[in-house]
From Swiss-Prot:
This is Prenyl transferase. Its cofactor is Mg(2+). InterPro entries: Isoprenoid_synthase_dom_sf (IPR008949), Polyprenyl_synt (IPR000092), Polyprenyl_synt_CS (IPR033749). Binds 2 Mg(2+) ions per subunit. It comes from Porphyra purpurea. PROSITE patterns: POLYPRENYL_SYNTHASE_1, POLYPRENYL_SYNTHASE_2. Mg(2+) 1 binds at D88, D92. The gene is preA. It is an enzyme of class 2 (transferase). Belongs to the FPP/GGPP synthase family.
Length: 323
């Protein structure tokens, strides 16, 4: 199975540059914000989002070159993603992320909210300096999508009546919108036609959805060590994801546990057992596979190249994260 480092080989130098720049994003004028941002970016992460932006940029360039604006867009994508995680952790009261203390636990809630706000503002500043108004419009829409997704999620906590379609729509707003918009933005900076913009947008959308579905599978099937946070953390907070929704169609007892919000100390372990027993995890993985197949179809117009191969292989990497 390919590793993320081998998949990123065509953009290895550019990704290293992005990583280096992220660690200095807050500057030294704001010591507390700098410390918070440094903590966030040094905690690591998969950096899949900036990598996808760079791969799209190279895949759609005749010379396989990455423009400065595209490199900056890759950084902006990760900054926006990180800002959203800071706010998510406050809302969900998470204590760890990527195996490290969350910002609001390391500092306090006020600093965490301000750090997230600062990163969103910083991303907007960098975005404006790319100098392409259409790209600015595409990317800034993502920030409103994040808020929309968070509101939708908050309104259906511990609600077993939500559908898979509701879940997919919420997942688009919270996760896939950023990947989709960033892919479109990278293509726009290479002056491609609108159909190509749309195909790459859809690639990003389907990849983002597949990634979110597999994240939700891992939340239930993964270990605390591999996740960097307690397993089952999302559904303990009432966030009902694909494996749970599929399990609900087979296990009536699970509905009862959700309705009482896992109030008994044994409810969580019983819920995990029922989800695994019902085949909910397998069905969720099948849903993720449908998304990656749709993503692959969106790349058919691109000529063969190493960056295109990496974009295709990334789909398999996402699906095999549990292997």
């Amino acid at each position: 199975m390919a590793t993320s480092s081998s998949l990123f080989h065509p953009i290895e130098k550019e990704l290293y540059s992005v990583e280096h720049n992220l660690k200095s994003v807050a500057g030294t004028r704001h010591p507390i914000l700098y410390a918070a941002a440094k903590h966030l970016f040094e905690a690591g992460g998969k950096r899949l989002r900036p990598a996808i932006v760079l791969l799209v940029a190279k895949s759609t360039s005749e010379q396989q070159e990455i423009k400065p604006g595209q490199r900056r867009l890759a950084e902006i994508t990760e900054i926006i993603h990180t800002a959203s995680l800071v706010h998510d952790d406050v809302i969900d009261e998470c204590s760890t992320r990527r195996g490290e203390k969350t910002v609001h636990k390391l500092f306090n809630t006020k600093i965490a909210v301000l750090a997230g706000d600062f990163l969103f503002a910083q991303s907007s500043w960098y975005l404006a300096n790319i100098g392409n108004l259409e790209v600015v419009k595409v990317i800034t829409k993502v920030i409103t999508d994040f808020a929309e997704g968070e509101i939708r999620q908050g309104l259906v906590h511990f609600d077993p009546s939500i559908s898979i379609d509701d879940y997919i729509e919420k997942s688009f707003y919270k996760t896939a919108s950023l990947v989709a918009a960033s892919c479109r933005g990278a293509a726009m900076l290479n002056d491609l036609n609108s159909q190509m913009h749309n195909d790459l947008y859809l690639y990003g959308k389907h990849m983002g959805l597949a990634f979110q579905i597999m994240d939700d599978v891992l939340d239930i099937a993964g270990s605390t060590k591999s996740l960097g946070k307690p397993s089952g953390a999302d559904f303990m907070n009432g966030n009902l994801t694909a494996p749970i929704l599929f399990a609900l169609t087979q296990e009536g007892k699970l509905d009862q546990l959700i309705q009482r919000e896992f109030s008994d100390e044994r409810d969580i372990s019983l819920a995990l057992f029922l989800i695994k027993k019902s085949g909910g995890i397998t069905k969720a993985k099948d849903l993720a596979k449908e998304q990656v197949q749709a993503a692959l179809c969106c790349l058919q117009f691109l000529p063969k190249s190493a960056p295109v191969s990496s974009l295709k292989e990334l789909t398999h990497f996402i699906i095999t994260r549990l292997s």
